[in-house]
């Protein structure tokens, strides 16, 4: 990528992220890492890099960047584990994979400062993962995506979108609901187009002219139907409607999940939200933040019937899409539920959801609003170990469970029933009281009570990730902050987990031990 484009991307990203995440409990360094790492991922994934031995200065600079992003209080304790992944067709993703090793067996290096060089791995652990081909050409142009949002929000969202959208061929239609005339913002639109081009995103901007008497978020979102019809492409097999905080783990996997359905027929495909409370309130529909998908024949019918459907508006886009489908189709096109699309209308500590071992995992929503987790950074693992390893649970011999890209948890009193979801969350905004067993029964199954953090459950949470040379390795940093009352000797604690595909000479000490997961 040209230096000018990188500077433009960094400037736009910094401004946009500041405006959108002002009220989100994220460390500023985490988003500095995101802005810097996304261009690195793109450039290194499109051209091969010649591995070279890392110098002490290179290692020190990389360590310094990571430590600054973590917001640690020195001195701190540090452990490091390295995995050498081996993609194989013999392995499939399951809810829980057993690894024949003690993850925390090596005592931590204690009392490190921010200026110390982080200790290297003593060995590399070989781990089989589901097969993927990082060199395979990606073409998901048959999937045409659309989002209704504001100019500032799409500005902030493009870097995260690029994690899963760059270079795929899928067009992104952006309905700018705060811009009735794009000519009035020609310079700003031009900068957004340049930003998207640098990120290899095929983007289309469309203005929105709402009714001055009656307008709503629902009408704005449903206006995508006519916009899709205006920009229809002959190769489109599916239209996908998303929110600006919808994150796809893998667009090829998403398109593969739609393969059983004939796009020449009318289809309305999506997922319910997690809690029975909201389903009872809003009815049976595809929730928009999880992403939902409409076949071309049905989209054409909805676009042609837009004027007839607008009076049905109740204020929410996904409700209006459903009600229009009910109004104009005969026989009625009913919702087809697709597992793996996740609305995540959950509040509070949602670690129980992330650590529940859900599969498939196609989309994640609300990751920067109702809750915060650096999903774009967490997803770096997919470029090195494949999409099926993202949020995969690995259980180790020492009663430790790593949810890849989210957390490392030690259970001092033995493993709980990991087949049950830990009920750490509530079902609505600002609700602290945990719901009853039946609230999530249809979506998550039976649950178990939340464990006492620090006593029954000791957790390190992913706070930062960065690629190594040629995007053939990724460094993950899981952090446990010191808690008042833990004792005078308690410190912030970091577990670095490094993953590599192939050998990167000089980066790690590779005394390989086979700890292949039993899947």
Task: Spell out what each predicted region is.
Residues 5, 246-334, 338-348, 352-359, ...:
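Conserved catalytic core of nucleotide-sugar-dependent glycosyltransferases
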Residues 2-7, 403-519:
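Extended non-globular C-terminal regions
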Residues 238-242:
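Short aromatic-hydrophobic micro-motifs that form the base-stacking/packing surface
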Residues 176-237, 249-252:
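Active-site-proximal specificity loops/subdomain of glycosyltransferases
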Residues 142-152:
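A conserved hydrophobic helix/loop-capping motif in glycosyltransferases and polysaccharide synthases
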